[in-house]
């Protein structure tokens, strides 16, 4: 049997993959929302699964609102630069380095935090893009204190991890959940019982036990009144998902922000 391999330059592989994805979507007569399309296509590109064209659902303006939150560090940097500029004009060269440090601190303190439920998802998020926005990623799953508390209480580490993340104040929190449905269930509880107001929830855990139900809990937030009903989310309905899907959704959000390079 003769197998013919196509020669393609490395830099062109992703572009051609996306073109093939669009061809298949056209063949299936699937029309995606223009804003949501890059997110859906990246999920398909990551998984080779066209079901995401049907089962990936978005709350109203979820993409734009999450991108705005991811840009919080840029907004903080601009404000700090303006403030630092006035100080450095008076302080001279010695004041300039102090102003630079203040700017960096402002970005770090203002930037969004993407919280994942696996180190795999965290590792898959573009470090360059996150850093360019003054944002950061965190995963509490391997924290010894989280593991110890989870054992003592008889709950999953994902539950305790969400509680730890919810303690972070005054910074936009975007939760990217690709593995543990208990993380979504706990987020739902924290939203109702502890006043947690995430800047976004990416709910794409994969599996069988309580996976569908946990996702439906997040979808049900849209039925509530503000402010709970205003929490933006992106959810993969059904059993499909995974840490790779959670990471690729975050990356698709990042890559759609002006001036963000991979």
Question: Where is each model-derived feature located?
Answer:
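Electropositive, gly/pro-rich neighborhoods at or near active sites that engage anionic ligands
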Residues: 1-74, 106-108, 112-113
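Intrinsically disordered, low-complexity terminal tails and inter-domain linkers enriched
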Residues: 71-110, 224-228
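Buried hydrophobic positions in well-ordered alpha/beta secondary-structure cores of metabolic enzymes
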Residues: 117, 202-203, 249
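Short glycine/serine/threonine-rich phosphate/pyrophosphate-binding segments
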Residues: 121-124, 181-187, 208-212, 242-246
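Long, charge-dense
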Residues: 129-170
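Glycine-rich phosphate-binding loops that contact phosphosugars or nucleotide phosphates
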Residues: 157-158, 166-169, 174-194, 209, ...
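C-terminal functional extensions of proteins
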Residues: 199, 209-262
């Amino acid at each position: 049997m003769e197998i013919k391999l196509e020669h393609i330059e490395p830099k062109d592989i992703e572009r051609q993959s996306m073109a093939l994805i669009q061809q298949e979507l056209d063949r299936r007569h699937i029309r995606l929302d223009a804003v949501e399309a890059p997110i859906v296509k990246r999920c398909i590109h990551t998984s080779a699964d066209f079901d995401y064209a049907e089962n990936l659902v978005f709350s109203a303006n979820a993409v734009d609102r999450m991108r705005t939150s991811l840009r919080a560090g840029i907004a903080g940097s601009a404000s700090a630069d303006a403030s630092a500029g006035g100080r450095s004009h008076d302080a001279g060269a010695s004041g300039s380095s102090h102003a630079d440090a203040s700017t960096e601190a402002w970005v770090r303190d203002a930037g969004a935090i993407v919280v994942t439920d696996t180190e795999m998802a965290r590792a898959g998020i573009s470090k360059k893009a996150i850093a360019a926005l003054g944002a950061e990623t965190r995963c509490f799953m391997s924290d010894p204190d989280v593991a110890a508390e989870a054992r003592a209480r008889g709950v999953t580490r994902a539950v305790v991890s969400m509680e730890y993340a919810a303690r972070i104040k005054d910074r936009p929190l975007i939760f990217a959940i690709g593995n543990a449905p208990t993380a979504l269930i706990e987020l739902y509880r924290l939203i109702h019982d502890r006043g947690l107001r995430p800047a976004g929830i990416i709910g794409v855990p994969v599996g069988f036990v309580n996976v569908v139900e946990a996702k439906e809990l997040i979808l049900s937030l849209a039925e509530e009144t503000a402010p709970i009903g205003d929490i933006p989310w992106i959810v993969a309905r059904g059993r499909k998902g995974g840490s790779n899907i959670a990471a690729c959704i975050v990356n698709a959000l990042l890559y759609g922000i002006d001036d963000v390079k991979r």
